Amino acid sequence: MPIRNLGQIVGLAAVLTVLSASAQYDYFDHNRQLIRNGVQAVLSCNGLFTSHRTIDQVFSDELAYLGERVIGTASSGNYTVNRDARWVGVGGGTDGDRVHAVFREGIGCIVVPPDWDMSSTDELPTIDLSYRTDTTRLPWPMGDVVTPTPLDPRISKSALSAAETWAFERSSPEQKTVSLLVLHKGEIVLERYADGFDMTTRTRTWSTAKSIASTLIGMKVDNEELALDAPLAFEWLPVIKDRPAPDPRDAITLRHALHMSSGLYPVDSFGMEYATGSGLAYWAGASSVDGMRNRGLIREPGTFWDYENYDTLLAVFALKQTFANEADYQLFPHKALFDRLGMTNTLASTDRFGDFIFSSQVYTNARDLARFGLLFLQDGQWQGEQLISREWIDFVRTPAPASHVRGNDYGGQWWLVPDERKNEVPSDAYSTAGNRGQYVIVVPSHDLVIVRRGLDYGRQGFNRWDLLREVVKAFPSAASN
C-alpha cells in the first residue's frame, strides 16, 4: 500500500474518531445536572414544607423519581435543609451547581438560579390567602364533613372493593398509589390513602395542572375577555428592531396552544425537558414566560400535535394579559375557582417572577381534585351557579384535529379515551393526566368522578383507562338509573 494512501486512511480514521467523540459528547450535560439538582431541591422543599412530610418519607417516595441520581440519603448528603427559613439547597462542587428552592406563602416552593443571593428570599413572590375562612367543618362538597349514607344497592360492593385492591396492590413497586377517591352522583363512595398520607396531604399534580389552567382560561373565554381563534396577544422573543410585520408566530391562536398544536419548535420532546426547554423554568430558576415565547415557528399552526409544556404556558400567558395588575392575576385562580369549589388546600406555584407554572406546578389533595372533577360532571354548575359553560366543556372534550394520528385522545388540555379503548371503557370519559400517576377521570354516563394520586417512578406507568375499566364494573350507567 502506498504511503500516501496509508496516510489518507489514518487521516480519515482520525476524523471519524473526532466525529464519533463529538457525537457521543452530551452538550447538555451541565444543564442536566443543574436540572437534576433542581428537581431534588423542589421536590424536597415541597415535600417538607408544602406536603408536611418527613425527610425519610421524602427520600423514599418523592425522590424515588430520581432513582440512582438522587444526592445523599435521608440522614446526610450534599444538600441543606433550612427549616427556619424553609428552603432546601442541593448540589455544589463535583455534584454540579447548587440549586435552592424556597417555600413561599400561598405558592409553595419556588426554585431560584444557582447565583441567587439567599439573603434576598424575601424578594420572591407570595400570595396572601389569609382572607380565606375555614371550610373544613362544612358539609361535603364545600367542606370535609361527610355524612355516612347507605351505598346505592345497584353498586356492587365486591366489584368496588376489587377495584380498590387493584389500584393499591400493584405488581410493580414503581406504581405507588397514595390515594384513590370515587364519587358517584357527587357523593364519596370510596376513599383510601396509603400509609403516611391522609385527606389533607397535598402532593404535586404535575400535568393535571394543565386541565385546571384550561378551566381558568375557559372562564375568560366565556366572559369574552379571550377568544379561541384570536392570535395570542403578546410580544414574541427575541425582540428585534425593525422586525418585518407581522411576525409569523402571530398566526398562532389560543385554540392552537390548548390543542398542543402551536407549530413552534419543540423543546420538551424526547426527554429534552430535563436538559432544556421548560425544565429550566421548572427546576433551574429561568423565566417560564421568556422561554415559551422564544421559539421559532417550524410548522403551520394546528397541523401537528406535539406535547409541549410551553404550549400550555402560551395559553396561560394569554390569560395573564387580561389583567390590569399582578395582584388580580395572582388571586384569580383562588377567587374564581378554588375558593368557589372549596378547594382551599390547593396551591398554584409560580416562577420567581410571579408567573404561574400552570403546566405542572400545583399542589393539592385528592378531595380538592374530586371537587374539580365534580364541577365538570355537573356540566360546569356549582351550588346553583354556572362557573364554566357547557360550550367550554364541549370544547375540552372534543379531539384536537391534529390528534387524529394518536387515536383522537387529546382535547383542550384534557385527555380523551383513545379510539382503541372505546370498546373497553365508557367512551364519554375524559381525564386529566399528570406525571407519576395523577388522574381525575370524569365519566358522565355513569355519574362518576375517579381521582387517583400516585408517586410512581420508572418506566411502568399506571394506566388510567385500566383503572376506569376496573372501577366502572361496580356501577350502573346513568341511563339505567
Regions found by a protein language model. Give the residues of each.
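Bacterial N-terminal signal peptides
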Residues: I9-V18
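Structured C-terminal helix/loop/strand segments within mature extracytoplasmic catalytic/sensor domains
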Residues: N31, D115-M118, L124-P125, T432-N481
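Beta-lactamase-like hydrolase cores
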Residues: G143-K185
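Active-site SXXK
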Residues: G186, R204-D229, A257, A315-L319, ...
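Active-site-proximal alpha-helical segments within enzyme catalytic domains
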Residues: S214, D311-K320, S360-W382, Q438-G454
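Active-site helix/loop module of the DD-peptidase/beta-lactamase fold
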Residues: N223-L264, N294-I298, A324-S360, T364
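Structural helix-adjacent loops and short alpha-helical linkers that scaffold large soluble proteins
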Residues: E224-L228, K320-H334, G380-I388, H404-V405, ...
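Active-site Gly/Thr loop motif
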Residues: M343-T350, I393-V449
